[in-house]
A protein has these predicted regions:
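Membrane-embedded beta-strands of outer-membrane beta-barrel proteins
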Residues: 79, 117-119, 174-176, 217-219, ...
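N-terminal secretory signal peptides that target proteins for export/translocation
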Residues: 1-9
């Protein structure tokens, strides 16, 4: 456990050194990837896709994200790569690595990493038909594999031999995004969508007992001080209210998952294809009450810090 934490710390140091080195590269536009590797904010995708030519494959974008999950959810590290092609499609892969330096009763339910694959197709480009009001509209999916977290981990922990092993969770979504530029010196970014999902908190807490339609959205103000770009915004992501070992199983009694909120700042320096993200995520606190006198289950993840770095080659 200590050895894995040491490797993670070395990896973070190497990534920051790489980021500094990349700042000396050729100028280009930045590519902003979210927690799961999609073009987006922190926890929600935008309708935009990774940059690519209309008749070819674009250069890849890479990202690293870190979330201080607390004593229960543990620290999570995301390494992503995303590629755009045909001017309107993107696809990518993200690996989640977890550092379980804590040793509590519950944190071992959330100490396993997993894989995430995603794809997105832009159906309607922004400002189509030479208009100024048409949003970009896209459809996409997210597939998370090799998950052993939350309810599944609890069942495996209490039963020998493990009855399940791993599970998968998925999102299928429709999203619209518009950058409003009519307000002088203050562009506004608005994004909203709906998804069908069987995942709880992007798979961080595991699976939901059934598929549900959940809404999500983001809004941000774009500032351009001294040719730099600073985006300040907020996001909301509805969650399935319950969790289960696997989709189709009975819900674990007494659990209630709240809507996930995030407040983010994105800085894009002038002249380099790089951006930095800083966010505060309200994930979940007491999900099984009353969480007093040692009773209930408190995830202690109401105000968690996240950071991210994205770079496009």
């Amino acid at each position: 456990m200590a050895m894995r934490s040491a490797y993670v710390r070395r990896g973070i140091s190497a990534l920051f050194v790489l980021a500094i080195a990349l700042c000396t590269g050729n100028a280009a536009s930045a590519q902003s990837l979210d927690w799961e590797g999609q073009t987006g904010a922190l926890i929600t995708p935008f309708a935009y896709t990774a940059k690519s030519p209309a008749k070819g494959i674009g250069k890849p974008a890479v990202a690293f994200h870190y979330l201080s999950g607390g004593i229960i959810l543990n620290d999570a590290y995301q390494a992503s790569i995303t590629v755009g092609f045909l001017g309107r499609v993107e696809a990518g892969y993200t690996r989640t690595i977890v550092s379980d330096a804590n040793d509590t009763i519950y944190n071992h339910l959330f100490d396993e990493g997993f894989n995430t694959f995603h794809g997105k197709v832009n159906m309607i480009p922004e400002n189509m038909g030479k208009t100024t009001w048409v949003p970009a509209i896209s459809v996409g999916f997210v597939a998370r594999t090799n998950e052993k977290r939350g309810g599944l981990a609890l069942v495996n922990l209490l039963t020998v031999p493990n009855p399940y092993g791993t599970t998968e969770t998925y999102d299928f979504y429709l999203v619209g995004t518009k950058t409003i530029t009519q307000i002088k010196h203050l562009p506004i970014l608005l994004s909203a969508g709906v998804k069908g999902t069987n995942a709880s908190i992007l798979g961080i807490v595991g699976a939901a007992p059934d598929w549900e339609a959940r809404a999500f959205g983001a809004a941000g103000f774009v500032f351009t001080p001294g040719k730099q770009t600073l985006i300040l915004g907020a996001e909301a992501l509805q969650e399935p209210n319950q969790i289960a070992p696997k989709t189709g199983d009975a819900a674990i009694p007494g659990i209630s998952i709240p809507t996930t909120l995030a407040y983010f700042a994105r800085f894009v320096p002038s002249g380099v294809p790089l951006n930095f993200d800083l966010a505060v995520a309200q994930i979940a606190g007491c999900i099984e009450g009353p969480c007093t006198n040692g009773e209930g289950l408190n995830l202690h993840a109401r105000s968690r810090i996240g950071i991210g770095i994205s770079y496009r080659f």
